[in-house]
């Protein structure tokens, strides 16, 4: 079955992680015609080494590739280095620029390693922040949405301490996240999603018994969203609403509220979309797996599902 109908840019992520390997493994499962719609961004040397490890050298012959990101040869599998962090950002940035310029229709980026990127001296809290910075947008306009196991969960905050997240949460930030996620759901074939907003505190604060945060932040956001004509329930306790599984879209206030259910139900099959920007970008719902990099045992299921998700014919 053909799964790729649109032009895609595929950045290989951290070249010392499993990105080069899963990129090649996913591409191997596509037809030649489908591969012709995908341009790969990243150091060629890392792809060559991954191909040798996985005995896929012949795949490189018809690979459409653009060199992006410097890397010492050979790749240091599993090593967390500033050079690999810089390469990650360079390859993803080149792919985003290609999409912004109309050369491709969407961007897929393999896993990054945040420590490597920070060691390169680059402020980074995930692909959503990178997308916002490359596009010149405010980071409060771009969010992460995980898709997997029948769930769609947008995160209002992401890679920051709980203290920082609580200081940054506001009704407007929640509204921004939901509006971006509803637009994305339309692109994914769910035009009028039923939305559930998680509470910040347990039991959505239990009528202020556990704090004022939900009455001050999530409840006003829900009221605003309803006035915009959206079908929104909440705020509700995340545990209760996830157990019911009655909604099309869930809104997590904190990182673990959204990541735990997705990684429990779809550990190797989730997509991680950066939403709210004028470029469609997705990564996968797992990390760079430095502990198994360069061994040829990485699972490309999540990447292949992400390719299918973004490669589908629009409309």
Curated annotation (Swiss-Prot):
The protein's matches in InterPro entries, at most eight in alphabetical order, are given as: PdxA_fam (IPR005255)
Reactions performed catalytically:
(3S,4R)-3,4-dihydroxycyclohexa-1,5-diene-1,4-dicarboxylate + NAD(+) = 3,4-dihydroxybenzoate + CO2 + NADH
Q: Which GO terms describe its biological process?
A: phthalate metabolic process
Q: Which Gene3D superfamilies match?
A: Isopropylmalate Dehydrogenase (3.40.718.10)
Return the EC number.
1.3.1.53
Q: What class does this enzyme belong to in the EC scheme?
A: oxidoreductase
A Pfam family (short name) is: PdxA
Instruction: Provide the residue positions that the database annotates as binding a divalent metal cation.
Output: 159, 203, 255
Keywords linked to the UniProt accession: Metal-binding, NAD, Oxidoreductase
Recorded GO molecular functions are: (3S,4R)-3,4-dihydroxycyclohexa-1,5-diene-1,4-dicarboxylate dehydrogenase activity; metal ion binding; NAD binding
Q: Which PANTHER family match?
A: 4-HYDROXYTHREONINE-4-PHOSPHATE DEHYDROGENASE, D-THREONATE 4-PHOSPHATE DEHYDROGENASE
What the protein does?
A: Involved in the degradation of terephthalate (TPA) via the protocatechuate (PCA) 4,5-cleavage pathway. Catalyzes the dehydrogenation of 1,2-dihydroxy-3,5-cyclohexadiene-1,4-dicarboxylate (DCD) to yield protocatechuate (PCA).
Instruction: Give the similarity note.
Output: Belongs to the PdxA family.
Q: What's the protein called, per UniProt? A: 1,2-dihydroxy-3,5-cyclohexadiene-1,4-dicarboxylate dehydrogenase
Underlying gene: tphBI
